[in-house]
Structure formats: structure tokens, C-alpha cells
């Protein structure tokens, strides 16, 4: 018995030792795994810090950039994207440049940066396109905007690398209260930017603005560009109603006009060249007027004056400058033309081509214009009478002529050529009979093929009718007339029903999701009002397209954003496929993808568009926090 107990004790001791050894082994393995993981992380960090060379070009990133450039006087940088076709095409040339500059005395480093992964550097150097080339001189970036040829780039780099090289003075003029009036009043035309030093949009505009200034300074005569620090020159900012940054204004001999052009070099240059020309063209012969009326396709605007020194003519020119992007203005000093138009000199005449005239509206709209007439009054008169009672809506004039709502559109085969004009006018005349009784609405005819997508979205492409009609209202909603034989009576009933609020809108929509509990709410056409326009909640809405590369890149970031704010009951992070669903409020304009708006609770008609800044978690979070009307803590803050 004692012997058996002894054996049991021996076995227990042996088992205990085995378990201890196994545990130690596991611990050793765990430690090894941890050490291996740490070593792998350190290797990855080392990879980021190590500067590699590919075909003579140094490869830089956010991690190794500062150390690499710290001791170098001059470095040539190329910011590229792996998918960029121009970058791929430029690569062999860039390698030749690297080889040439490597043999320079002293050698000049040539480097490239993948701007899609080195986001900090891309942001620091304001990279907005690919490839972007910059020359780093003693740590300061010098923009290169010449051709992408070895000869020109090498020459510029060598020029900048010289010990006595200094940046050229800015071409953009700096204005203060002391010199503003002298400069602006004496310029036939000048573009002035009111900026704030801390403004991100201003910083982004600055290099493009300077490049445009350089380009326009070469013209004969030159077109000057200037800038005003509105935070310092507060009196000037107040004088010209500057309420945001940057604000750009065109001045003609001291008279201010809004700048509505692009904000990059070539866009600014083209816009200012166009603006520098006369806003109104002189008509010299009666034949020109007759051709406008016979063959024209838009409103005919003619000012008739005593001469180019007539004060009324100068006021007309001011009005024309305000509207020159939307209308073609003409003027004449010819008594013969005045007689043909049955007016005296000192008048503004608006008329429409013969095909758009009708018995329900005057042939000519005439306004007295004197030296005391305000340019704004002329402008208002032109806008008021620019459309005929029933005009021709086309894709080329839609944005400028038919943006006003409600808009009644009648779709059929519209063709004003000789063979088909009678048929086109037959249906247009039926529309005219209704339009005359609803002056508060805009009426137009439109070719059904030009607007095939719109007709399809209205559910009318398979109507079986030759003529269809719809109404587009102020909120972005669309109403389709039930398919039936078209005549004036059916159109009148349709418009009357709309006026009384008895019509239901047509909404293009994907199916409503059955399960919509994810971190990012899916919005479709039928749920836009319920989710985005919910007056009790703040909503961040992304409008995307399934084929859009930038949208695909944003998707994981946007999902992370949704998870971050998931616990906030008064905030919704949402997305909508804008190619498959109607946006039922026209305040949410989408001109590209992705487009992001913040719709604040209680103020849904004034959404705030996300502009500038990177579409990353940090910047999107900051955007939300800045505009949130009801703030609660996120998961990260708890």
C-alpha cells in the first residue's frame, strides 16, 4: 500500500514538471512571436525611412523626405500617381533628367513621390494634379510650369541651383488703402483678389493666381492681377462687401464687377482675356438686324445711342458687362436701324427671332435709356424679357435660360428646319394658348431625343404618345402628365392641377433597403426627404457614382466615419448613388463625384458643401464637428 502511494507521488511530480516545461515553451514561443512582430514593424518603419533609388531617381515618402532634403541645396521633385497616364509617359524622360543632373557639378538630386500614398507631402506642396514638378531650393518650393522636356527642365533646375539665384518678384500687385484707388481707377481692366492669410482656399489659389498674373502680364496691353489682404485692409473689404475668402472682383476704370470664372491658371487667363474685350458689338448695317431676326436662335438685344460718348451708352456698357456671360449684347448709332425698329435713339430694344414670336406677346420690348438710368435697371429689364412666351429648351441653353422654376416642358420632335417647321409650330401654338394664362410659370418645348434620359426618368419614354409634358418645380421634384392625346385643354388641366397641389411627383429611385442599420445609411430617391431632409437631425450625405474611382477610394474612409459617429442619435452619416436616384431638392447640386453636403437640422434648405481639404477621416470629422448643431461625444471621446 505504501509502495503504491509512493509511485503515485512520483507520477504527480513528473506530470507537474512536464506541464511547467510546456508552459515555459509556450511562453517562449509567445515571446518569440511578439519579438518577431516587433521586428516586422521595425522593418516596415525602416523601409519607410530608407531612401531607395530606381533608375537614378530617389524614391521619397512622408517618412524619409525631411532627412533626405535637409542637407541639399537643390532637389528636383516629381509628384505622381501610379495610375496616371501622363506620369507613365513622362517616366523615361524623368530618368534621363536624373542621369544628366547626377553628372552636374555639383550633382543635383532628382526624386519622385507617390502623392497618392504620401498624403502629408501632397498636402504640404498643394499637389492637385499629376505629374506636378517642383524644385526645392534651400527647403523652399519653386513651382515649375514649363514644358515636360529634358532640355527645359534641366535648364531651369541649373538656373535655380546657382548660388546667387533668388526667386523673381511677384507679378501680382499688392494693394492697400494708400494705392488701391490710383491703381484700380487707372486700369481699363484689373482682377483683384481679397484674401486672408490663414484661408486654405486662398493658399490653394495663390500659386495659380501668380501663374495667371505672369501669363497675362505678357499680353499687349497687359491685364494686371492684384491682391488685397482683407484682414489688414478692413476698410477696403467693407467697401466692396467682402464676406468670404477669397473674393475676386473685376474692376473697369474703378467700377467693380463680380468675377465668375475658374480658379486655376488657364481658366483665369482665358476668362480675363474674354472679359477684356468689349461687352457689346456694334451693328453697322440693317442687314445684320434682319439676319438676327430671321436666322437667330436667342433673344436679340440692341441698344440705340447718339454715339460712343453718350452717357446712356456708358450705362448700357456697364449693364452688358454684368451680363456678358449670359447674353450677347449689340449696339448701334444708326438712325436707319432705329427707324426699322420703330424707335428713336436712346432706347434699348429686346426682340426674339421670328420663329419665337406670337400674337400673345409684343414684338418688341422697348426701354428708355438715359445717362441717369441705373445699369442695374437695364440688367433687370433684359433678364425679365429675355425669354419668349414659349421658347426652345436645349442642352446648350438649359443652364442659362431655363433654370427658373416652375418650368413646364412639352417634349416632341422639335425641328425648326424648313421641312419640319410647320409641324413644330403646330404643337408650339397649342402650348402658347396655355402659357398666356400662366405668366408665373416658364414654358418651353424640348426635343424628345435631346432629353431622352429626362423623358425616361419621367416614365414617359414608353407612353406611346407623340407629345408628352412635365413640370419641374422649385424643390427639384418632377411631375409627369398622364399619357393621352395632347391638346391645349389637356395641358391646361395638367398645369391647373399642379397649381392646386393635386399632382404626385415622379421620383427615380432604387428599391428602399430592407436593412438599413449599418454605420452609413443608404439613401434612395424615395427616402431622400425622410432621411436627408429630416428637420430634427444633422445629416452628412455623400453623393457618389458606382464607377467613380475617387468614390471607391473614399468608401472605407466614409465607413470608418460612420462607425465613429454611430452612437450619435442626432447625426446621420449617409450616402446616395446619384446616378440611380433623384435628388428631390435642388439645393443639393451635384456637378462631380463624390460630392458631400452637411444638412444641418432646422436649416435643410441651406446645406454646407464640403470643399477643400483632404477627404480623409480627420478632415471629414473636423467638418462635421464644425457644423454640428447638436454635439455629443463620439466613441473615441468616451
UniProtKB/Swiss-Prot annotation:
Region Disordered: start-end pairs: 24-50
GO MF terms held by the record: integrin binding; protein disulfide isomerase activity
Gene Ontology CC terms, in alphabetical order: cell surface; endoplasmic reticulum; endoplasmic reticulum chaperone complex; endoplasmic reticulum lumen; melanosome
Motif CXXC: positions: 84-87, 548-551
Residues bearing glycans: 36
Keywords, sorted A to Z: Acetylation, Disulfide bond, Endoplasmic reticulum, Glycoprotein, Isomerase, Redox-active center, Repeat, Signal
Domain of life: Eukaryota
Pfam families: Thioredoxin (PF00085), Thioredoxin_6 (PF13848)
EC id: 5.3.4.1
Disulfide topology: 84-87, 199-202, 548-551
Location(s) in or outside the cell: Endoplasmic reticulum lumen; Melanosome
Acidic residues: bias regions: 32-50
Motif mapping: Prevents secretion from ER: 635-638
Signal peptide positions on this chain: 1-20
Ranges for domain Thioredoxin: 21-162, 162-294, 498-629
Family to which the UniProt record says this protein belongs: Belongs to the protein disulfide isomerase family.
Protein name in UniProt: Protein disulfide-isomerase A4
Amino acid at each position: 500500500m505504501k509502495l503504491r502511494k509512493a509511485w503515485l507521488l512520483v507520477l504527480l511530480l513528473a506530470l507537474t514538471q512536464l506541464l511547467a516545461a510546456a508552459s515555459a515553451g509556450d511562453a517562449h514561443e509567445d515571446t518569440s512571436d511578439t519579438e518577431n512582430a516587433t521586428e516586422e514593424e521595425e522593418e516596415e518603419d525602416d523601409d519607410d525611412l530608407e531612401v531607395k533609388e530606381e533608375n537614378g531617381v530617389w524614391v521619397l515618402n512622408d517618412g524619409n523626405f525631411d532627412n533626405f532634403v535637409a542637407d541639399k541645396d537643390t532637389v528636383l521633385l516629381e509628384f505622381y500617381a501610379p495610375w496616371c497616364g501622363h506620369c507613365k509617359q513622362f517616366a523615361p524622360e524623368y530618368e534621363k533628367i536624373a542621369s544628366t543632373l547626377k553628372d552636374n557639378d555639383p550633382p543635383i538630386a532628382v526624386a519622385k513621390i507617390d502623392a497618392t500614398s504620401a498624403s502629408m507631402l501632397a498636402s504640404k506642396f498643394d499637389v492637385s494634379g499629376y505629374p506636378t514638378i517642383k524644385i526645392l531650393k534651400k527647403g523652399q518650393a519653386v513651382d515649375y510650369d514649363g514644358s515636360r522636356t529634358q532640355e527645359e527642365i534641366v535648364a531651369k533646375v541649373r538656373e535655380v541651383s546657382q548660388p546667387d539665384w533668388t526667386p523673381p518678384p511677384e507679378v501680382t500687385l499688392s494693394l492697400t488703402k494708400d494705392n488701391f484707388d490710383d491703381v484700380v481707377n487707372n486700369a481699363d481692366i484689373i482682377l483683384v483678389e481679397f484674401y486672408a492669410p490663414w484661408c486654405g482656399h486662398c493658399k490653394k489659389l495663390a500659386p495659380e493666381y501668380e501663374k495667371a498674373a505672369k501669363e497675362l502680364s505678357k499680353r499687349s496691353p497687359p491685364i494686371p492681377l492684384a491682391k488685397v489682404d482683407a484682414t489688414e485692409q478692413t476698410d477696403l473689404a467693407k467697401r466692396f462687401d467682402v464676406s468670404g475668402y477669397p473674393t475676386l472682383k473685376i474692376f473697369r476704370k474703378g467700377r467693380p464687377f463680380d468675377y465668375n470664372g475658374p480658379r486655376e491658371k488657364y481658366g483665369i487667363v482665358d476668362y480675363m482675356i474674354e472679359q477684356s474685350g468689349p461687352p457689346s458689338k456694334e451693328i453697322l448695317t440693317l442687314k445684320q438686324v434682319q439676319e438676327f431676326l430671321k436666322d437667330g436662335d436667342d433673344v436679340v438685344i440692341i441698344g440705340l445711342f447718339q454715339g460712343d460718348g453718350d452717357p446712356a451708352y456708358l450705362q448700357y456698357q456697364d449693364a452688358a458687362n454684368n451680363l456678358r456671360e449670359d447674353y450677347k449684347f449689340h449696339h448701334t448709332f444708326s438712325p436707319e436701324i432705329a427707324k426699322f425698329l420703330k424707335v428713336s435713339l436712346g432706347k434699348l430694344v429686346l426682340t426674339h427671332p421670328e420663329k419665337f414670336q406670337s400674337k400673345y406677346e409684343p414684338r418688341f420690348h422697348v426701354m428708355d435709356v438715359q445717362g441717369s438710368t441705373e445699369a442695374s435697371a437695364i440688367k433687370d429689364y433684359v433678364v425679365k424679357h429675355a425669354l419668349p412666351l414659349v421658347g426652345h429648351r436645349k442642352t446648350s441653353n438649359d443652364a442659362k435660360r431655363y433654370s427658373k422654376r416652375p418650368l413646364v416642358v412639352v417634349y416632341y420632335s422639335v425641328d425648326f428646319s424648313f421641312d419640319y417647321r410647320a409641324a413644330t409650330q403646330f404643337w408650339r401654338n397649342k402650348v402658347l394658348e396655355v402659357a398666356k394664362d400662366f405668366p408665373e410659370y416658364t414654358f418651353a418645348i424640348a426635343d424628345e431625343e435631346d432629353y431622352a434620359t429626362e423623358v425616361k426618368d419621367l416614365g414617359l419614354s414608353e407612353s406611346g404618345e407623340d407629345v408628352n409634358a412635365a413640370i419641374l418645380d422649385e424643390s427639384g421634384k418632377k411631375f409627369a402628365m398622364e399619357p393621352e392625346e395632347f391638346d391645349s385643354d389637356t395641358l391646361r388641366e395638367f398645369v391647373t392641377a399642379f397649381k392646386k397641389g393635386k399632382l404626385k411627383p415622379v421620383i427615380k429611385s432604387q428599391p428602399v433597403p430592407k436593412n438599413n442599420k449599418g454605420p452609413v445609411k443608404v439613401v434612395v430617391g424615395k427616402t431622400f426627404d425622410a432621411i436627408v431632409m429630416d428637420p430634427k437631425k444633422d445629416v452628412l450625405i455623400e453623393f457618389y457614382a458606382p464607377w467613380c474611382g475617387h468614390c471607391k477610394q473614399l468608401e472605407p474612409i466614409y465607413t470608418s466615419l460612420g462607425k465613429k459617429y454611430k452612437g450619435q442619435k442626432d447625426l446621420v452619416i449617409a450616402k446616395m448613388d446619384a446616378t440611380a436616384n433623384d435628388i428631390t431638392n435642388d439645393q443639393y447640386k451635384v456637378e462631380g463625384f463624390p460630392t458631400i453636403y452637411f444638412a444641418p437640422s432646422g436649416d435643410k434648405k441651406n446645406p454646407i458643401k464640403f470643399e477643400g481639404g483632404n477627404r480623409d477621416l480627420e478632415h471629414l470629422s473636423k467638418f462635421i464637428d464644425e457644423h454640428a448643431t447638436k454635439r455629443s461625444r463620439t466613441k473615441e471621446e468616451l
